[in-house]
């Protein structure tokens, strides 16, 4: 495995050729500046000999068909392995769901991004590949963040693409973080990366980014970088800004961020989440409606169990509508425009 990676510098190819395991962990050094550790398939760490003050996680492929972030991360990994760029921050790359990537599908059995914060082991337990992998990914995050001295800034960007078109092509979900201010620097980093829209979540979830935020105090985000396309069919020029900013972060180059101003970004507050309670749940709007579509107050969004679900507030908009989820799961997130909350 080691020689294959040293020869190809293609960690994604190695991962997809061995989607369940790489066998034993292995490590090697790049020049005299970086120790590289491979902990598992899709799990690679860059440890600078003289690390600066940030611990950075870039995860992708939690959903197997969201390919642009996978290609983006593999490009960064390849540049690091080729020593075209040199890591100055401790950096962990996670390719989340290799089995689903090989399958060309969002999932194998279950939505992995609903299985963190221990949800993977709640009944029915570790019964499918996503649950097993989510538990492992949690352990790798724990090992990485605890592998350095306390007091360092912890960052986790969980990269995705959306199943539908969007009024705002690139957007981020800021996990619920009671008692902690939102980071002005992080919001402006996202803006510089081309992610000009931020949703502030209103409650705990079982997403990967919430796990890192809540358990480790990380500046963590679920970041949607555009629309789903098959592997190799992404227009990677649309991700130049994001790739450049991630590279600057990892290599400790100046970020040159603008000061925070609410008029430079689109801010939304999650006002409610609508879950599915009956098999007959259906939306009233077209299946191809774009993310951030708004509806007038009183508009009937959906019907289930003989009841109507209506828009409750003026200027309420929606993201991630999906009626074809299991009972108990989220069908849509509802948003309202937000004045900047506690941003510092």
Curated annotation (Swiss-Prot):
| InterPro entries named in the record | AspA/AstE_fam (IPR050178), AstE_AspA_cat (IPR055438), Aste_AspA_hybrid_dom (IPR007036), SuccinylGlu_desuccinylase (IPR016681)
Keywords (A to Z) from UniProt: Arginine metabolism, Hydrolase, Metal-binding, Zinc
Tell me its cofactors: Zn(2+)
Residues that bind Zn(2+), according to the entry?
63, 66, 160
Could you tell me what reaction this enzyme catalyses? N-succinyl-L-glutamate + H2O = L-glutamate + succinate
Catalytic residue list:
224
User: CDD domains from the entry?
Assistant: M14_ASTE
Q: Which GO terms describe its molecular function?
A: hydrolase activity, acting on ester bonds; succinylglutamate desuccinylase activity; zinc ion binding
Q: Which GO terms describe its biological process?
A: arginine catabolic process to glutamate; arginine catabolic process to succinate
Pathway given in the UniProt record: Amino-acid degradation; L-arginine degradation via AST pathway; L-glutamate and succinate from L-arginine: step 5/5
Name the Enzyme Commission number(s) assigned to this protein: 3.5.1.96
Function according to Swiss-Prot or TrEMBL: Transforms N(2)-succinylglutamate into succinate and glutamate.
Per the record, the similarity remark reads: Belongs to the AspA/AstE family. Succinylglutamate desuccinylase subfamily.
What is the name attached to this protein's record? Succinylglutamate desuccinylase
